[in-house]
């Protein structure tokens, strides 16, 4: 049978999602916990592979198993075997047509910036701190150039393995609440480092280093070298993955906040 899971994790102390020898990863941690519940080896497929230090409030995975367990047994049993930084939120049997990655129709990320003079303590490694003033007005103006279907070569990592750099950004919003600046972005899919590179460009514009139209110039250049610095992973969260309604999967009631 095929089981879908929703989970959240604090990525601060993980070397990313994907299993790698000799380092702690979210995938390996989850597979070890689920294997203990299933009494057999379990391999999970994820909706999106997050980088080292990146967090998730609503990651989705699936796995195949010959072991029958009630839904709450996968949740409680899995969580009993997981590290505190990872939690299974829900479990649901799905038909074999469901695929956590390929069935997804949209992914939503949130990038959180603490924009104040003093560094964070409680939110350390869970937000990106920037001490100089940032103009949300300029960041909003710049973000509008990136909405729609474009070649995002300037925003992909050098090691990105995606066959095509074309992605469709459904929306990109920048908001401020007190000292907090939030970048919300949704697309059909994302390239490696795409959100962090977009955040880096918007922050450079917010600082006043570049005008808002620079975002369009970077996009049109189709060259990573012109795109400036990749933003830190600390403030990045995967907050939702959308699937066609007929799969009838649970959804979080609200995205992550830290205020």
From Swiss-Prot:
Pfam families found in the cross-reference section: PseudoU_synth_1
Positions contributing to substrate binding: 109
Presence of keyword Isomerase: yes
Record GO biological process: tRNA pseudouridine synthesis
InterPro entries: PsdUridine_synth_cat_dom_sf, PsdUridine_synth_TruA, PsdUridine_synth_TruA_a/b_dom, PsdUridine_synth_TruA_C, TruA/RsuA/RluB/E/F_N
Active-site residue numbers: 51 (nucleophile)
Membrane-spanning segments: none
Keywords tagged on the record: Isomerase, tRNA processing
NCBIfam families associated with the record: hisT_truA
Oligomeric form and interacting partners: Homodimer.
Function of the protein: Formation of pseudouridine at positions 38, 39 and 40 in the anticodon stem and loop of transfer RNAs.
Protein's name according to its UniProt entry: tRNA pseudouridine synthase A
Organism of origin: Nitrosococcus oceani (strain ATCC 19707 / BCRC 17464 / JCM 30415 / NCIMB 11848 / C-107)
Organism lineage string: Bacteria, Pseudomonadati, Pseudomonadota, Gammaproteobacteria, Chromatiales
């Amino acid at each position: 049978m095929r089981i879908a899971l929703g989970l959240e994790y604090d990525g601060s102390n993980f070397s990313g999602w994907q299993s790698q020898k000799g380092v702690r990863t979210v995938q390996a941690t989850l597979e070890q916990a689920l294997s203990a519940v299933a009494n057999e080896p379990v391999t999970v497929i994820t909706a999106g592979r997050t980088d080292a230090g990146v967090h998730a409030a609503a990651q989705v995975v699936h796995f195949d198993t010959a072991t029958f367990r009630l839904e709450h047994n996968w949740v409680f049993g899995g969580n009993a075997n997981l590290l505190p930084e990872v939690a299974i939120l829900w479990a649901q049997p799905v038909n074999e047509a469901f695929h956590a990655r390929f069935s997804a129709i949209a992914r939503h990320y949130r990038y959180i910036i603490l924009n104040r003079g003093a560094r964070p303590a409680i939110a350390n490694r869970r937000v990106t701190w920037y001490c100089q003033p940032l103009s949300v007005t300029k960041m909003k103006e710049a973000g509008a150039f990136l909405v729609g279907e474009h070649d995002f070569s300037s925003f992909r990592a050098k090691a990105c393995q995606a066959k095509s750099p074309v992605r469709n950004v459904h929306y990109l919003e920048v908001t401020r609440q007190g000292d907090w600046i939030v970048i919300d972005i949704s697309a059909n899919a994302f390239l490696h480092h795409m959100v962090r590179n977009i955040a880096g460009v918007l922050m450079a514009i917010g600082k006043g280093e570049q005008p808002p139209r620079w975002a369009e110039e970077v996009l049109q250049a189709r060259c990573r070298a012109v795109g400036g610095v990749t933003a830190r992973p600390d403030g990045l969260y995967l907050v939702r993955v959308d699937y066609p309604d007929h799969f009838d999967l649970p959804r979080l009631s609200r995205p992550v906040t830290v205020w």
